[in-house]
C-alpha cells in the first residue's frame, strides 16, 4: 500500500552567498543569510497513477552539455530545458499544477514565510572528542599525563565490558547533510533573485542549499 503525500510543498535550489545584516521596521539589526535562487526549472513531474506518489523535480545551475551523460541529456531534452547541474525532487500534493519546463522564481516565497533549509555542513576533517562532541577532557594537573584531550573510559571497565554502538569518539567531523528548520524569510528581492533568510544556514559560501516549506508549520 502506498501512502499518499497530502501536503503542499514549495521549494527552490539556490547558492549561499554569505551573511549580512539589515534593519527591520523597528530599526533593529537582523542577521540574514543571502541565497541566490535563479534558473530553477521543472524537469519532471510525478503522479499517483504512474509513479504512486505526487512530486515535482527541480533542476538548478548551469553545466557544460558535454559533461552530461546521454541518459541525463535525454531526460532534460524531454522536459525541453537545458541541462542542469543539480536536481532535487519534492513531494507535494499540488504537483499537477506545475508544467514541464516551467521556470520558478524567488516569488514562490514571501516575506515572513517559514522555511526549512537543507545543506551540507562545512567539513572539519578528523577531530577529537573535545571539538567534535564538546567533551571536557582531563584535568590540566593533579597527575594527568598526556591525557588532557582524551575521552576517558569508553566502557571496558563496566558491565557488560564492551563498547556500545553510538559511543561518541574522535572521527570525521562535518561534511554531512543537515536541515535547519523553521527559519523566517526576512525579505525577497525578485529583481536579483535573492532570498534573505533570518539566521545562519548550513554549509560554506558558494554551496548549494535547498529552501523548502517548513514541516513544522504545516
UniProtKB/Swiss-Prot annotation:
Pfam families: Ribosomal_L3 (PF00297). The keyword Ribonucleoprotein applies. GO terms for cellular component: cytosolic large ribosomal subunit. GO terms for biological process: translation. One of its GO terms (molecular function) is structural constituent of ribosome. Residues 137-157 are annotated as: Disordered. Signal peptide: none annotated. InterPro entries: Ribosomal_uL3, Ribosomal_uL3_bac/org-type, Ribosomal_uL3_CS, Transl_B-barrel_sf. Keywords: Ribonucleoprotein, Ribosomal protein, RNA-binding, rRNA-binding. Coiled coil: none annotated. One of the primary rRNA binding proteins, it binds directly near the 3'-end of the 23S rRNA, where it nucleates assembly of the 50S subunit. Belongs to the universal ribosomal protein uL3 family. Part of the 50S ribosomal subunit. Forms a cluster with proteins L14 and L19. This is Large ribosomal subunit protein uL3.
Amino acid at each position: 500500500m502506498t501512502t499518499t503525500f497530502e501536503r503542499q510543498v514549495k521549494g527552490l535550489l539556490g547558492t549561499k552567498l554569505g551573511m549580512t545584516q539589515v534593519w527591520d521596521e523597528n530599526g533593529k539589526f537582523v542577521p540574514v543569510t543571502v541565497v541566490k535562487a535563479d534558473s530553477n526549472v521543472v524537469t519532471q513531474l510525478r503522479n499517483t497513477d504512474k509513479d504512486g506518489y505526487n512530486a515535482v523535480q527541480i533542476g538548478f545551475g548551469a553545466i557544460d552539455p558535454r559533461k552530461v551523460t546521454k541518459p541525463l541529456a535525454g531526460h532534460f531534452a524531454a522536459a525541453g530545458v537545458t541541462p542542469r547541474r543539480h536536481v532535487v525532487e519534492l513531494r507535494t500534493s499540488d504537483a499537477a499544477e506545475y508544467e514541464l519546463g516551467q521556470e520558478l522564481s524567488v516569488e514562490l516565497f514571501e516575506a515572513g514565510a517559514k522555511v526549512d533549509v537543507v545543506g551540507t555542513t562545512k567539513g572539519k576533517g578528523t577531530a577529537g572528542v573535545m571539538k567534535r562532541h564538546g567533551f571536557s577532557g582531563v584535568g590540566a594537573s593533579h597527575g594527568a599525563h598526556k591525557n588532557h584531550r582524551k575521552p576517558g573510559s569508553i566502557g571496558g571497565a563496566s558491565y557488560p565490558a564492551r563498547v556500545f554502538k553510538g559511543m561518541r569518539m574522535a572521527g570525521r567531523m562535518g561534511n554531512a547533510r543537515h536541515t535547519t528548520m523553521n527559519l523566517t524569510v526576512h525579505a525577497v528581492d525578485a529583481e536579483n533573485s535573492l532570498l534573505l533568510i533570518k539566521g545562519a544556514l548550513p554549509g560554506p559560501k558558494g554551496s548549494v542549499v535547498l529552501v523548502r516549506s517548513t514541516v513544522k508549520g504545516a
